[in-house]
Structure formats: C-alpha cells, structure tokens
C-alpha cells in the first residue's frame, strides 16, 4: 500500500487531524487537497450533469493547479515506478470481425447514457455503429436496428416532441420490422407521452403502450429481474434477465396486458 491523497479538507485543523490519524496507522500521506467548489461537477436528479451540457475546462484547470501545489508529485512518480506489473491473464482479446449489421445509436444531449463495454460488445459482434440525434436529425440513418440508451429526455421534451419527422421515421421503421431496443430514457421516448416535472405533457413516439410522468422524488432503486413472455431480440420465452432501476419517473400502461 503506497499511501493516500486526502481531499475535500475544510481547514488546517481538519488536515492536521487526518494527517495525525494516518501517521498513527503508518499510512503515508502523498497530498492534501482542500475543498473547492470550483472543482465540483454540477449535479441533477439522476446524478452528474452530462458533459455535453457543461464546459469542464475551468474545473479541470482548478484541479490541475491544486494537484501541482498540494500533492507530492515526485513521491507519487517514484511510487508508480515501484509498482509491480498487473497480471494480464484472463483479458479477452478483441479480433476484427466482418461487419454484419448497421446499428443506429441515439446520441445527443437527450440520450448519452451508454456503457462503453456495451457499444464495444456490439462492434465485437460485427455491428457497424452509426450515431444520430433524435433532437436534431429528421430521420433515422440507413441502419438495420436501433439502440436508444438512457439520458435526460425529460429535459428536452419540447424539442423531442416537436421533431415529428424523426418520430414518424421511428414508427415506420418499427412497422417494417426493424429491431428497436430502448432502455431508461430511451424507453420513455418510445411511450405515448411524457409529463415533465411541471405537469406539462408531450407526445412521444408511441411504440410502447404506456405514459410516463416525472416525479420530484426517487421512485425506483435496486436490482430487478424479468422473465420473457414472448420471443424477442433479447432472448426466448422463459429466459431471465437481470437489470437495475434508478428512476425519478413512473410508467403507466395504457393497454392490458402490458
């Protein structure tokens, strides 16, 4: 164990107290960074504000300057030199595969929550990824399937609802049998309508027979499981899926069964 870098320290006394505790434990302190509001990333109801909506230049510069002054960089570099090599066994190698399908990925200010591993897995399986914007583009790109990830569509409901040509393109693609996978905010976009925090309701794509409404408090959090009732692109009947919920919205089916 090489040591620690203290952060969010509020005062000289705070730093002295923590350093004393670390000394008693025999833990080297490589640096001590003071609390500074300029270093913080702005937050929203689901967590951090997406980088597409902010300019992090000032915060990064503040962090850089603080590290230069408050961290023993020479000791940190020497510590890095003494580190043992990490074992690479078990790491999967990615080999080039023939591109077998063109997959559209919704990516803009409203939809940006994607695990890089998910996109890499698609490419490793032979997908050619094509990014598009449900906010700005008039229609889907020339693709074989579409992936709508999460994001903050509730912050852009007016623009999403006004882009009727994109909605028409998605509905037409669905009618022609194109596979469409939507999760989180993407699923909200696929419903009939979404009501924002102020109670305003906006028509959406309408492929999912349900409506969504934003709430002021957290509605769902935790792990869930699902059982396939019909065969689909994710599995066969009775297959089980595991997932995670973290929602400030509620969904109400408009048809039964859902």
Q: Where are the language model's segments positioned?
A:
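Residue-level signal for short, function-critical loop segments
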Residues: 8, 107-110, 211
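Hydrophobic residues at beta-strand termini and immediately following loops
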Residues: 33, 132, 208, 246
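Short acidic, glycine/serine/threonine-rich loops at helix termini
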Residues: 13-19, 41-47, 116-118, 158, ...
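C-terminal and late-domain segments of enzyme folds
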Residues: 70, 97-99, 111-123, 128, ...
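Phosphate-binding active sites in nucleotide-utilizing proteins
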Residues: 99-164, 168-175
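Cysteine-nucleophile active-site neighborhood
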Residues: 153-233
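Internal gly/pro-rich beta-alpha loop/helix module
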Residues: 1-95
